[in-house]
Every structure is written in C-alpha cells, then in structure tokens.
Amino acid sequence: MMDEQRKAEYESQSLQLRAELKQFEAEWAQKNDGKKPSREAIKQNPDIAQKYKQYNKLRDILSGKIPPPTKSNNQDPSQRKRKQPETSLPSASTPSKRNRSAATPKSQHYSAVHEAITPDVARKLFSPAVPSSIGPTPQKDGRVLGLFDLISHTPSKSTDETKPRASGFTATPSNRRHALDLENDKDDDDHDEKDGKEFITPSIPRHRNLDRTPSSGRNRNLLDSFLGVRATKTSTPLNKNTGNSPSKNNLTKTPSGERSVSKLQFATPAFLRRTSAPLPPVDENGEWLDIEPLKLPRKPFSIAKGKGLSSVVASLRKMEEEKLDEELDMLREMEAMEQGGMGPPPPKQTVASTSEDTEKKKQVTDPAGAEVVPEEENSFEEDEAALIEVEASFLESPSSKRKKERRPVLLSGFDDENFYDSQDEEDLSKEGLDRNGQPLRVFKKKGQKRTTRKVNMRPTRTKRPSAPIAEEEDDGEEEHNDVIPETQFDATKNLDGDDHHTLDSLSSGGSGSEFDDGSEGEDEEAETSTTKAAKAAAKKKAPSAKEKTKKDATTETKKKKGTKEGGDEEPAKKPRMVKATANANFKRLKLKNNGAKGGPAHNSRFRRRR
C-alpha cells in the first residue's frame, strides 16, 4: 500500500502532465482544423511522447495496475556514484558510464560457434536437402518465417560472447591492459571479462551472418536443430592437440581430426547412418587410400513374369536333378572301369522306360517263345537299382520318411512330374471314355432357338369319289338339273382331307391369300390341320357296304322330307363374292396382344376420354 503523501505526489504529477498534454492538444487542433494529434505526430515530438508515457505510467500506478517503484529504482542513474575511484582510471580513458537502459533487452540464446569454423561443405553434407524456395512467402532455407522472425536484434552488442577479440581492437585501453605485454593477452581477457567489460567502448560488431535472414535467438536455434546443425557451445569438435593442428589459437584454419576434408567428401550424413558409432579419425598427412567398392544390398529374388513360385521351384528342382544325374553317370563310369573295362553304362532310365521294362518282365510266356534276357544284363540292372535305392535312402531324412508313411504324397515343385502325371484326357476322350473308363455323355450343342415356326410341306393327294355316291348322283340328276355341280359343296373332298378347294378358294380365283380375313397364324394352322387330316384319311379304310347303304337311305329320306315340307328345294348357298376394291392394306390385323394397353379404345381419337 502506498502512503497518502506519495499518492498525493503521484496525483499532482499526473495533473500537471495532463494540463501540459491538454495544452499541446489544443495548440495542435488550432493548427490542424480541430483534429487531434495522431500517434505519428506525437512520436515526432519526443518531449510530448515522453510526457504521454509518464502520464500513462502514473495513472497505472494510481489505479493499482503497476506497483510503485522503489527508491533504488526511482533514483536517477546519473546520480549513482562510481564503484571505482577515478585515480584507478587513466587520464586519457573514456568515461566508463554507460546508459544501459538504451540497449534493447534480448533473451539469452546460444549461438552456433562452429558456423565460423566449420566449412560450408560440412553444412551442406550433414544437413538434409531443403527446397531453396517455397514461393512468395518469407522463408529461410525452405522454412516459413513468421512476423517476429523478421525483426532484427539491435547490433549494439555482439551476439557471440565467446568470439575471440583482437587485443585493443575498438576497445578503450584499461589500466591493467595498458601495462601488460601481448604474451599475457589470454590471461587478461579472462580477467577483463568480469571487471573490464564496463570500460569497452560500445561499437558495432561485424556480423558474420549478413547473408542470412535475421531472426530471434529462439527461432534460430529451432532452425539450426531442424537443419541438423548443432547450436550448443560445446558441441563443435574443435582442433585437438594433435600433429595435424600447428597451433592452439589458430582458429582461422580448417579444423582437422574427426571432421576432415576427406571425411566430409565421403562420409554418410547423420540421418542416413544405421549406426551411431563414431568413425575412426583420418590422418590427413598419411597416404591416400583407395576407395573401396560400395557394398550395395542384393537385389530381391524376383519371379519371372507369368511364372508362379511353384514353377520356379520345380525348375530349380529339375536343375538339381540334372546335376545329380551327371554325377551319377560319372560314378557309373568309374565303377565300370573298376569292374574290368566294361562298355559305357546304358542311358538313364526315365519313368516311361522303367514302366516298359517292368511290363516286359511281367510278360511271362512259354520257354519256347519267351525272349530270354542274358544274365549279365539282369545282374547289371539289379545292381543299378540297388545303388539308386541306397542313394535315395541315404538322402532321405527320417522325418521325410515318417511324413510319407502318415499321409499320401502330394504333387509339388520338388516332385517328378512324369511319375505323378496321369494319362492324358485327350486320349481318353478320343476313345469315348472318361477317367474311370465309363462312356462319356454326349452333350448336344446349345444354339439359338428357332424364331419362326417350322412347317413341313407335304403334297396333298385327292381321291376319286366311290361308286355308290356317283350312282346316287346319276339317279338324282333329273331332280337337280337346275343346280350347278361346280358351285355345290362336296363332302367327299372334306373326308379325303382336301380342304384347299373350298368355296372361298374357288371364288377368290387363286388370290385368296391376298383377301383372306385370317392372319398368317391361321394359315399355318390350316396347313397343319390339312396335313393331319390327310394322314388320318389315309389310315382309315373304305366304308363297308352296309354303312354305304345306311348313308344312302338317310340321305334319301332327308331329301323327301325337304321336298314335302318346303314344296320346293332349299336354295343353295351362294359363294362368297370378293369386291374389286378389296386390298390387303385394308385388312384388319388380328394382333395377339390387342388390348394389352387398355382395350380397343386406347389412344383413340373418337372415343370418350376417361
């Protein structure tokens, strides 16, 4: 809490400053048409700007936002006494008083010391490839920078405190350094870092990173870590005290030892190394060693295009078998030479040849007609078979024998194809048998079904009328003289199966197909009915004499009754007359799906709308 006295002092100061600022604003408004001063105008007048800052500070103290300053902080820095007496300073020395409040405060950061020492080759080799540009965005080595990264720090003080300084360069000579020799420069530098720093004239140091975009220390460390550059002070491997480095303090030469030029040219970058173990140091003064060939990884086993793994394994198995067969042939030749200069052994037997040999052995005939095999050949074949069995049993492992006993052997890439291959199905199909020897089922080829109706056209044969019917017609000619026989319907023709010569067909004069009411389907049905009737009539026998007499009697009685009742004969049916204007275009079509969309009145112009 503030005292009442101090609070009154702050209030009086704030009122006085407020009155001065109001007077300034009034004068500014008179000059600028009643406008208030802008921030740029206030910044151009440093006295008024200072008064604004002081007034805002006093208002914050009175409101409690800022604690009141203590007496030590409130004291003017110009009133401070010197810690060292003036007698200790030389007469020509620059006064040691420095206005440190003018310096821009900056956060502590670690500068990469080795950047001035490590060559550019190392930075390129030991850092990942970064795109040089991303676009119009402000960036540094491919990394986008923010607004605060573009602010450069004040160059009033060197950012590198460990940078070696030449003795007496842009520095005020102190009383201690004035009496010392150049040999004790290093000891004086260590001692002056504590006491003599205050007597150095502020100067603008030479920045070695003038080609880089200025950024804050924190972001620079992040960028250095991102680019693979170490930013600590102790991480740079400096020159060791070896024979490669001539002097300790010669920092302008390329460092040797672990990071030599020869190593920088051929070393693998850190992010590509598989092991983090350090490499042995390279002696630059030694002889140049030949570069060893690169040990590249083997190409993966690639299967040929269109081949599976089983086919590849089978081909490898065949190659191994061929190699073993060659070795076996050589063994046979050696055995033949040892046995007494016998001729060369017979060629190796395939599965087919062995099967033929077994069949020959099985074919046992009479001694007179049997083919006697010489004993020498039999003995040689037996020895060879025994040798093959011994080799097979030697090569087979007990586990494989057990597996063979347990389950049947399956065909794989390591088996002989000829041994397991069955008879070709093509040969069996030629014989008309399947695998089991059963006759194959004959399948009919399925093609497109018929789209039109198949009609078998057969000639129709007409038969002459029988004798009794003709006699009856002769007897009744007198009664029916006025009737034309060509126009009358003949029942005998229908019985014989001749339906073509109807009254309609006669009256149409050969053009019944054009003016017939029936459609094509009806014509086809008529044709089939005629053929069936013709067949049925051919099968039937001629009627007996009794049946003929009965029919004649019935017809006579019917005629007599008709004459008695009607007085006159019934008029004959008139033939159908076809108009001369009749045409096939005017014939009504009898469609099968008529009425499928709503009856005959569908889409009709002269029907009532529903």
From Swiss-Prot:
Record bears the keyword Magnesium: no
Keywords noted in UniProt: Cell cycle, Cytoplasm, DNA replication, Nucleus
Biased composition (Polar residues): 86-110, 232-261
Chain ranges passing through the membrane: none
Disordered as annotated region, ranges: 28-115, 127-261, 338-610
Gene3D superfamilies: 1.10.10.1460
Region forming the signal peptide: none
Bias (Basic residues) ranges: 442-464
Acidic residues composition-biased segments: 373-386, 414-428, 470-480, 514-527
Keyword Cytoplasm part of the UniProt annotation: yes
Any one cellular-component term (Gene Ontology): cytoplasm
Lineage top rank: taxon: Eukaryota
Bias kind Basic and acidic residues: ranges: 28-42, 493-503, 544-573
Coiled-coil blocks: none
Subcellular location: Cytoplasm; Nucleus
GO molecular function, one term: DNA replication origin binding
GO terms of biological process kind: DNA replication initiation; double-strand break repair via break-induced replication; mitotic DNA replication preinitiation complex assembly
Family that this chain belongs to: Belongs to the SLD2 family.
Record function comment: Has a role in the initiation of DNA replication. Required at S-phase checkpoint.
Protein name as catalogued: DNA replication regulator sld2
Gene name per UniProt: drc-4
